[in-house]
Amino acid sequence: MKVLGKELLDNLLGDAKASPRRRAHLNLHKTFDDKVQRLFIALSKGSYVEPHYHELPHQWEMFVVINGVIRVTVYNSDGSKLKELLVGDGEECRAIEFQPFDIHSVECISDDALMLEVKEGAFDPDFAKVLLTSG
C-alpha cells in the first residue's frame, strides 16, 4: 500500500515553485512499461504547457484537479482555439479527458494547483507529445 500524504504533496508544490518550468512531477507507477501511468503534477501560477497532442492510438490522458485551478485550451489543427475552460476548485469541471490527437494546452491560473494524471502505458519518451507549430 502507498500512502501519499500532505507533506509529500506540499513538498511537490514547493519543488514546482522552485522549478524554472513552475511545475514538478511525481510518478506513482514503477516503470514507463507499466500499463497504467499515474502521476501527480504540481504547478505554480504561470506554468504553461504549450499546445500539443499525443499521436499514438493508446495515448489518451485524464487530468483530475485535486486543488487549484488550471485553464485548459483545446485547438484546431490550424492553431485556432476551439474551447477554453477552467478546471478545478469552484469550477463546474473538476476533471478532463483527452483522446489521441486532441490538441491542448494547460496553464495554472491559481497560486498553485495539484492534479493527478492518468494515462495508458507503456510510455515511450520518443513519442511523448507533438508540439503544435505555427505555419
Sequence positions of predicted segments:
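Short acidic-glycine-tyrosine-enriched beta hairpin
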Residues: 62, 76-104
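His/acidic/aromatic-lined binding-pocket segments of jelly-roll/cupin-type domains
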Residues: 40-41, 59-65, 96, 106
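Short beta-strand His + acidic residue motifs that chelate non-heme Fe in jelly-roll/DSBH
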Residues: 51, 72-74, 96-98, 104-109, ...
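Conserved short histidine dyad/triad with adjacent acidic residue
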Residues: 40-59
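A short, N-terminal "cap"/entry segment at the start of jelly-roll beta-barrel domains
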Residues: 1-37, 84-89
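Double-stranded beta-helix
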Residues: 3, 80, 105-135
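Glycine- and acidic-residue-biased ligand/ion/polar-headgroup-sensing regions
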Residues: 58-78
